[in-house]
UniProtKB/Swiss-Prot annotation:
ATP binds at residues 87, 105-109, 524. The gene is secA. InterPro entries: Helicase_ATP-bd (IPR014001), P-loop_NTPase (IPR027417), SEC_C_motif (IPR004027), SecA (IPR000185), SecA_CS (IPR020937), SecA_DEAD (IPR011115), SecA_motor_DEAD (IPR014018), SecA_preprotein_X-link_dom (IPR011130). Part of the Sec protein translocase complex. Interacts with the SecYEG preprotein conducting channel. Has a central role in coupling the hydrolysis of ATP to the transfer of proteins into and across the cell membrane, serving both as a receptor for the preprotein-SecB complex and as an ATP-driven molecular motor driving the stepwise translocation of polypeptide chains across the membrane. It is found in: Cell inner membrane; Cytoplasm. SUPFAM superfamilies: Helical scaffold and wing domains of SecA, P-loop containing nucleoside triphosphate hydrolases, Pre-protein crosslinking domain of SecA. This is Protein translocase subunit SecA. Monomer and homodimer. Part of the essential Sec protein translocation apparatus which comprises SecA, SecYEG and auxiliary proteins SecDF-YajC and YidC. May bind 1 zinc ion per subunit. GO terms for molecular function: ATP binding; metal ion binding; protein-exporting ATPase activity. Belongs to the SecA family.
Amino acid sequence: MLGSIAKKIFGSSNDRRVKGYRPRVAQINALEPEIQALSDEALRARTDMLKAELANGKSLDDILVPAFATVREAAKRVFGQRHFDVQLIGGMVLHEGGIAEMKTGEGKTLVATLPVYLNALEGKGVHVVTVNDYLASRDAEWMGQVYRFLGLSVGTIVHGLDDAQRKEAYACDITYGTNNEYGFDYLRDNMKYELSQLAQRGHNFAIVDEVDSILIDEARTPLIISGPVDDRSELYVAVDALMPRLRKEFYDLDEKQRTVSLTEEGNEFIEEAMREAGLLKEGDLYDAHNVTLVHHVNQALRAHTLFTRDKDYIVKNDEVVIIDEFTGRMMQGRRYSEGLHQALEAKERVTIQPENQTLASITFQNYFRLYKKLAGMTGTASTEADEFAEIYKLDVVDIPTNKEVERVDEDDEVYRTVGEKYEGIIAEIDKAHARHQPILVGTGSIEKSEHLAEMLKKAGYSLLDYSDPNALTDVYAAAREGRVTKRFAVLNARFHEQEAYIVAEAGVPGAITIATNMAGRGTDIKLGGNLEMRIEKELGHLADGPERDAAIAAIKAEIAENRTKVLASGEPADPAAGRKKDLPGGLYIIGTERHESRRIDNQLRGRSGRQGDPGRSKFYLSLQDDLMRIFGSDRMDGMLQKLGLEQGEAIIHPWINKAIEKAQQKVEARNFDMRKNVLKYDNVMNDQRKVVFEQRRDFMGQDSVRETVDEMREGVIDDLVARHIPENAYAEQWDVAGLREQVKEILNLDVPVEDWAKEEGIADEEMRERLLKAAETAYAERTEKNGAEVTAYIEKQVLLQTLDHLWREHLVTLDHLRQVIGWRGFAQRDPLNEYKSEAFDLFNGLVTALREQVTAQLSRVEIMLQEPPAEFPAGGPALPPMFAQHLDPVTGENEMDYAGFGSGSDGGGGPAYGFAAQGLAADGAVLERDPTDANTWGRVGRNEPCPCGSGKKYKHCHGSLQA
């Protein structure tokens, strides 16, 4: 109570922070008359003037006021929009590296122009991050008009660009793109062989739109680049055939944690069933050599118990397509990881696509922490403010609205059963539709949106198909005539193609729109209709001229009239029902259930009441909803029973809302803990990733890596001597035979080690010096024979390729370690500390293996004389087919797409001309492999992709023919 009194007197910390920006807002406003008087050329010249001030020692903060004033005037001239004072405050928050929380319709896109322009003046690049390609392209085109007017360049990073186009976009002053594209470009850059091929030029400043969606909802989802592995589709089908025979007592299912495991009885049943099916040929299921079978059983079990068709995924065109739980969109190209997607494909009897092996990965948490300065924008961040502060060191500032929010958020209506809840929703839709009030109904899944659609059809409503050319005509005719159409639209993954039209017209009088979660849609619902959409749809055939202008004026007038109707569509007071006040018109949001996160509910509510418009929102719940059933209090059901509610009757009370909010807070806290835990483990890999990537980039930047190669050779000899000649041991105790064998194997040297050991007074240091001298002499002769230029090229490529190969193997090993490390807790040992310790040992092993393998390969390189190319390839050896994935370590969800290597993009792979050393790829030769001529392949590793181009491993293709 004292806190609330103090808050009223002194204001909140947020109020005080916002107040602190007001003096600079006043300074910007004071500059406005002076800047308004400038010509376009003079306004554009201010960019060069501000750059000069930076070059002369001023900081970005020093020039913030004139820079913001310049952008404001440019935006006004380019598309007639002037930044409000609160938008200037939002821009300052972003410039300082904070999160600006701005309500729907408050112009976040326009706000970003202020800090983007200011920071772009440094010439180090500014990245604006959006959630999809459409928004990246739209915002770059729209806001790019302002930047180009002021003399800055703008680029866009979207799917399908080749490396040259990406490099050009990153070289611009300002770059728009999606979070996935930025992350994958970073990973791809760290798989290339020349600095000249790198697309990105550093991580200076990023502004993340919908920051809560990207840095919170997707924080656990690593970006993964992977390559194909062996086809095991028959095994997936065979294991899947066993799942329908499992009874419920054979497994433990935890919906809250989304986990499932076989009971002891279930293990016995599966073992016996697999023996009968010929899948378990020897030993027990959990024997080490059967670990792959265990993995397949677990994934098949998850597919059948944790994942539901039309809720978590749909089947379309012989594919299992994931549904995003936050937006309800189809995630074309996304795939679940670790064989789960293949298990779902087996379950649904569709074509099973091959699995992939991780080649490089990074989480969004660690990618975005690469930036020197990071900022974000969203309409809903306050509920996650603690997480932003702890993980990203970002403060959330609630920016005041330009106009007060007029939306009325009503208390939830809670029913006993789902059926009663839906009946209540249909009744409310009937009432609102009769008043011509536009309604947006939010559902949690495709399944639920289609269930509600079926109920509406039974109630006499029909589905509005926006693929029909006359659909919009009918919508507007009904609005003009004041007719009740009893028609509705469905916005979910199945109707993705119609999304823009459905959202644009959701504010027309009498519109009924059923939508899965609206998070990240990026399109405002405007009351009365969307002018731009109508012009595009209705006037696309008209050229510019008086006729088109007249038609546009008519559409504007009709939208204004429709807006007036929508504003007047509120529900009058009903004293008999205990409601003394009128309820407002505007867009009516009806939520069919609460989401696990309050933030998602707030995003749905925020679709109504934009820019001071009136609006209304209400959630309809039942005790059978997932949130209430899994996380809600058992006492709530008892309480409703005691109240003696009749069939179809609901309870409405603020206490119910508080109880639900507590359930949501429990879930949010659990999810936060999971994300923090993921980050702790990923930080271990991230530290190693930074070392490897920095070292790799250092190698790429050197003209010659001879010094590194020499140091590696010397280190290998030190290790060999230490391994076979114990300290202070007599010569008779030395492992001379082992030393000679290893010297031959690694250094390719045939030296009389036994004779040296018999010499009087010989010591380990003398042995080391002789081996080093012999190795250096042999390598110098090889270099002279091959030529210095060729040797330098081969050294660099061997070093980079070997590092890549070992790093990929290391990633797989760390992943396996992480999956089993949790069991250490049963031995009273901290799994995280155990993981750190073992990961460190594994990394040391990687460094040792790198020295030995590079030394061994370079000691055997021979040149095979063929027709020489015009010049040495800049790109190094060709890379195998690769895919980009977006993996969730908890749910297993993946985004997967071609990673930019292949047609249209060299991806750093370079031409087919390359080198090969024994033990790596071929017989130690610089040669060109012809896929049709096996004589040009040299020696191929059994696990390498077959040079014929089949995509299979060599041992399963041409290698099997030679075996």
